[in-house]
């Protein structure tokens, strides 16, 4: 039986016209996406005379994979930071809830007095309490969490680098609180304050759309004794 002779031109043609398979790389993790990007870039480099339609196809695939890689890296970073600051955020949320409940009771009490000046002040404090609670819930998972109730800093307060760092931290905290306040004023907060007060877990599906999913509170176990909760909350005073 005569041997089949392979035509190298056909092989070259197939390599030039081979379709790009990127679907299996989507959602597969950064390592596989990076490998796929390298494969396509290598293919383009080895075939400078690709047909125009294939060149467009490969370029589009590269752009899509690079976006997917960026999303994957952001998600990985969010997972790391979420784990790192999980307990800090949990206790700060508990503290913000407790403070807001007290502010609501105080506002109701003062409202009954009919004293405008006191009512106005209490209303402002109430709004600040609502902003604090929303801050803890909405602070981006892709950033190092900036505490609302930071513990005393043992670093040298005269060190220029320390002073600069504290200033940047305070500016970011103030900036995000203003962002929360704007959302509330425009009625765009993706959840209700009452839901947060009821202890529901509010998970954002997408930071851009700010779509909230409400479930049972599962962040961490409840303290069995109120004194234990108070002691842990006071850690952030």
Swiss-Prot record:
Give me the ranges of the annotated region Disordered.
Answer: 1-24, 206-237
Main subcellular localisation: nucleus
Coiled coil residues, start to end: 53-113, 166-186
* CC terms in the record's Gene Ontology section: nucleolus
Where does the record say this protein resides? Nucleus, Nucleolus
Keyword annotations from UniProtKB, A to Z:
Coiled coil, Nucleus, rRNA processing
What domain of life? Eukaryota
Compositional bias annotation for Acidic residues: 228-237
* GO biological process terms on file: maturation of SSU-rRNA from tricistronic rRNA transcript (SSU-rRNA, 5.8S rRNA, LSU-rRNA)
Biological role: Involved in rRNA processing.
Q: Which family does it belong to?
A: Belongs to the EFG1 family.
Recorded protein name is rRNA-processing protein EFG1
- Species of origin reads Candida albicans (strain SC5314 / ATCC MYA-2876) (Yeast)
């Amino acid at each position: 039986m005569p041997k089949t002779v392979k035509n190298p031109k056909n092989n070259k043609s197939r390599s030039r016209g081979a379709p790009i398979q990127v679907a299996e790389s989507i959602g597969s993790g950064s390592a596989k996406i990076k490998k796929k990007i390298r494969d396509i870039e290598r293919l383009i480099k080895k075939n400078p005379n690709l047909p125009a339609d294939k060149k467009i196809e490969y370029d589009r695939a590269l752009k899509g994979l690079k976006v997917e890689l960026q999303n994957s890296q952001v998600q990985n970073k969010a997972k790391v930071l979420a784990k790192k600051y999980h307990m800090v955020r949990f206790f700060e949320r508990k503290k913000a809830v407790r403070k807001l409940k007290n502010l609501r009771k105080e506002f109701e009490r003062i409202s009954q007095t009919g004293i405008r000046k006191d009512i106005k002040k209490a209303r402002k404090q109430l709004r600040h309490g609502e902003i604090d609670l929303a801050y803890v819930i909405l602070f981006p998972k892709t950033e190092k969490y900036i505490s609302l109730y930071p513990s005393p800093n043992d670093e040298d307060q005269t060190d220029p680098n320390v002073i600069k760092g504290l200033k940047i931290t305070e500016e970011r905290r103030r900036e995000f609180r203003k962002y929360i306040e704007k959302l509330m004023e425009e009625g765009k907060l993706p959840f209700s304050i009452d839901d947060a007060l009821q202890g529901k877990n509010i998970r954002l599906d997408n930071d851009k759309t700010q779509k909230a999913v409400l479930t049972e509170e599962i962040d961490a176990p409840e303290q069995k004794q109120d004194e234990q909760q108070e002691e842990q909350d006071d850690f952030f005073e």
